[in-house]
Amino acid sequence: MTTPIVDFVRQYAQSGTARLHMPGHKGQSLLGCEPWDITEIRGADELYEAEGIIAQSEANATRLFGTAHTYYSTEGSSQCIRAMLCLALQGAPRTGKRPVLLAARNAHKALLYAAALLDFDIRWLWPAPEDTGALCSCPVTVQALSTALEELAGQGRTPFGVYLTSPDYLGGMQDIAALSAVCDAHSVPLLVDNAHGAYLRFLPGGSRHPIDLGAAVCCDSGHKTLPVLTGGAYLHLGPKAPVQEESTVRNALALFGSTSPSYLILQSLDACNRLLSTDYPARLQECCDRLAALRARLNALAAAQGTALPLALDSPAREPMKLTLDAAALGLTGQALADHLRQNGMECEYADPRYLVLMFTPENPAEDMARLEAALAELCARGIPPAEPPAEHRETFCALARQAEPRLTVRQAVFAPQETIPAGSALGRVCALPTVSCPPAIPIVVSGEVIGPAALELFAAYGVETVSVVKPEKF
């Protein structure tokens, strides 16, 4: 497969041309990558008006992903999420009422920023009581989605889209095929934040990518699970996308993107196309198989110590290339287990009061898995001390769903005068900008909602120390 962006930049870097244009480093090495860092010179094409090498490279990606059209982003899935929602709004029938999005609650804060900028309401899908208990998870059933759509219809409102995060940060996956069928029956596009699942298209056992499973539009962060530089992402349009006009899509991306996209990131997306067209899918499957075997060994290791819980979360419905550990099986918090691994030369992706997330790809040498297994075996060999049952937040999350009272629209709250106060003092105040770290960038309380007792309890559990609230005299 061709790599038109890589080829052009390499030829330019080797040409000896005087760089009388941006960027200011002029190709002189400070970090080593500068010779290949260029701007929109003649022949380099323009990301948001692509007709040359970028368009050719995106066409390669479109064929690889099997979409109606795949577009590049150099600003991560955050840019793609905003563009995706903008396009869904543009493609929705005009009703004369405020637009509303039906969304699973475990959404990245980029969704809230989009709601503030595009000024739409959000009706939240909450997990069933038996499925709740973690900030990052929000399983949505066919029945729950059908009921929510019917309730909105009974109110004379049709959402301009259904928005799901799959895979989620802990590796859980929604039943996209079944949920897309529900959306089709109600003539509503399914929009999927697939930031953690770009590789799902390329599993030899069969694609688990949202577009192949019926989603109308989705975004992938190539940099999360493929060998792409940070910021490299894709906006994928399926045949059911509400807007297909190329200029409209590029304008939506441009609305939320810099006019100086990184050509280093574009080259990495371009080079990844060639890699995906070779034996990389087989390497992905090999990585998934090795992780499946590792999960089994870790669970056997923990069981031999008499643990009541499996150490590695494992089920066919889970994302295969993410290893999520339940630290409670070892009598630890996720943060404490992360510290133990850090002391043994390993850095994790995410840790919370209970879970630890480790992300592997084919680029990890086999020694990484061996080092992890040895560190966990050493921890088990010390003996797992008797511990209290892990803190259950199920009731607290259920209470959060009951207490989540919107006082302002997201836009009103985000743009209102605000102040930052200690989280413990925020009871009864209205959330302005969500104060959350990334990862996981999932807010406990969203902009415009009143902060209730359950939120305070979860702030403490997840280490949220301050919150941004609307100044009371301003509404």
PLM features: residue spans?
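N-terminal "arm"/small-domain region of PLP-dependent enzymes with the aminotransferase-like
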Residues: 1-52, 188
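Conserved PLP-enzyme active-site core in the AAT-like
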Residues: 2-10, 67, 76-311
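Short, glycine-/Ser/Thr-/acidic-enriched flexible segments
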Residues: 27, 169, 223-225, 240-242, ...
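Conserved N-terminal alpha-helix of the aminotransferase class I/II PLP-enzyme fold
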Residues: 34-79
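Structural signal for conserved beta-strand scaffold positions within catalytic alpha/beta enzyme cores
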Residues: 72, 124-126, 220, 350, ...
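Conserved C-terminal alpha-helix-loop-beta "cap" of PLP-dependent enzymes
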Residues: 299-454, 458-463
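Charge-dense polyanion-binding interfaces
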Residues: 467-475
